[in-house]
């Protein structure tokens, strides 16, 4: 079967990335409500690649997609931006022997915006 690139918007626990798939796999994504677009026939400008962000760009590279210019009359844009946040927190406490406790709390938060809901408009 012919393989082509589609954009997966991450619904139903699927990763947000551009993936190589068969037409049968693409139909499965459509049946489960996954929004997918055929992108194999399109090429990309450097500016568009930057707007989509490093995560999508890495996915393109893994799939062998090179940056180039968009075809005349085509516009690639984002209709949504999502943020995933991971927070790790740890609290340590010690008793000083007099019934008093000293505490130390450390936390680390990381926020990462991912391009989502990409669509093609003529």
Swiss-Prot record:
Residues 94-122 have a biased composition (Low complexity). It comes from the Bacteria. Residues 79-90 have a biased composition (Polar residues). Keywords: Plasmid. Residues 79-122 are annotated as: Disordered. This is Uncharacterized 13.1 kDa protein. It comes from Leptolyngbya boryana (Plectonema boryanum). The lineage of its organism: Bacteria, Bacillati, Cyanobacteriota, Cyanophyceae, Leptolyngbyales.
């Amino acid at each position: 079967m012919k393989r082509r690139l589609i954009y997966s918007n991450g619904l139903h626990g699927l990763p947000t990335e551009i993936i190589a798939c068969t037409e049968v796999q693409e139909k499965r994504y459509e049946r489960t409500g996954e929004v997918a677009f055929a992108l194999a026939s399109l090429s990309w400008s450097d500016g568009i690649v930057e707007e989509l962000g490093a995560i999508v760009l890495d996915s393109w590279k893994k799939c062998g997609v090179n940056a180039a210019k968009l075809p005349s009359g085509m516009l690639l844009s984002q209709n949504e931006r999502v943020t995933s946040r991971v927070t790790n927190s740890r609290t340590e406490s010690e008793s000083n022997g007099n019934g008093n406790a000293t505490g130390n709390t450390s936390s680390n938060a990381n926020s990462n915006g991912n391009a989502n809901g990409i669509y093609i408009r003529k």
